[in-house]
Amino acid sequence: MKKYGEYKDSGFDWIGKIPAQWDNLRLRFVCELRNGYTPSKDNSDYWEDGTIPWYRMEDIRDTGRKLQEAKQYITEEAVKGGGLFDAGSFILATTATIGEHALLIVDSLANQQFTNLKIRKSLSNILSRDYFFYYLFVIDDYCKATTKTSTFPAVSMELLKNCHIVFPSFCEQTAIAAYLDTHCAKIDNLISIQQKRIALLQELKQSVITHAVTKGLNPNVEMKQSGVEWIGDVPKHWKVMPLKFTGTFGNGLTYSPKDVVDNGILVLRSSNIQNSSLSFEDNVYVSKVSRDLLVNKGDIIICSRNGSAALVGKSAFVDKELNATFGAFMMRYIPNIEKKYGFYLFQTAIGQYKGYFSTTTINQLTKTTIDEIKVPLAMAEEQAAIASYLDHKCATIDTSISNAQHQIDLLQEYKQSLITEVVTGKRKVTDN
């Protein structure tokens, strides 16, 4: 790895030593900062026939770090006196999901989760926009490292404004950005290959589940018409009925920030459901709840409301006893049939329901809606066999998905490391 000839102390532990000829400036002197906001949802004039992109975290997750099109648009009436965020400026997530950034390709706005960063005109010939785009990966990490974990995490604006930007000459910045463009594109391509592999494996998994819960395990069984388009034919001896007859559905706990404690009863939220399993990396606790809202082994926890339609309907099976409840944007399904079979049945039903009726506009599932979704129901003696079969099949597919995700994680770590080394001068990529 090629290095610079001479280094100096940057004065900041999180940056370390930098090339002797490089400069540094605080972010407050580099950028103009503005906060994003959400226009009132109650005023239709702000939203109907809007043409101005209004970005949320979902846009970065689904589109990437260079934003042009948006999932939602607002009208000129919704724009406050400060005007739009300029094309060529950046947005940085400073609340909730800390440390994600994107370049704005067009004049636009973003919600209050983001802070807009615009390089000052006086520095336009000193600091390259393309170089700063990559330096924001370093700032992303700085924001994550300096923000305390809490229910509603937020970056300290004072710390952010005093964050230092280190940089070489404008000419070298341009060369560094070009180098990173090339190498990051190669890494992103490898990541994309693994992501496509995961998508295919997830499709295979859902196909295996759907076939088992609608056709059973006996390929020679006599079939009959179900009368439900998405179900198709089912074994002749099976029943077709609304979901409400397979168990009970109930809404979750409504709580406020003042109810949150450091330790207590875990509140399961959307972030606690990852890949159809419970995850315990983003936890919130409350001190007490009524007994009827406590989670039990065998329950199925469902995301019933979310700003992202793609997350609505995702579910997880509670496979052990927990000191937990579930939040207001969640529902619980307590099957009165074989419980793991009920989990697979629900996954199939809700997946088909969303795919058949809408793929983008369902942002909530109500008890009334779920109750009336029709499902095929195997005989009691078959339910355990189907659940056991699917446990084995899904475990094999999940292992392949996990391996692909591990490759993605390694590639993303390498990309972050490469960018950090280059924009802080630890690795020299230019010939001058």
Residue ranges with predicted function:
Residues M1-I15, Q21, F167-V221, P376-N432:
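Amphipathic alpha-helical coiled-coil/heptad-repeat segments
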Residues Y7-S10, T94, S108-L117, K148-T174, ...:
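A short glycine-rich beta-alpha junction/loop motif
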Residues Y7-Y37, D49, T63, N162, ...:
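Non-catalytic DNA-recognition/assembly elements of restriction-modification systems
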Residues S10-G11, R28-N43, E58-A87, K244-S256, ...:
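Sequence-specific dsDNA recognition surfaces
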Residues N35-P39, I60, D140-D141, Q206, ...:
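Generic structural signal for secondary-structure transition and capping sites
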Residues S40-E48, T147-T149, E222-S226, S256-N263, ...:
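Short coil/turn segments at secondary-structure boundaries
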Residues R56-M57, Y73-F137, S156, R269, ...:
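A short beta-sheet element
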Residues L136-D140, K144, D188, F346, ...:
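Short amphipathic alpha-helical signal-transduction/dimerization elements
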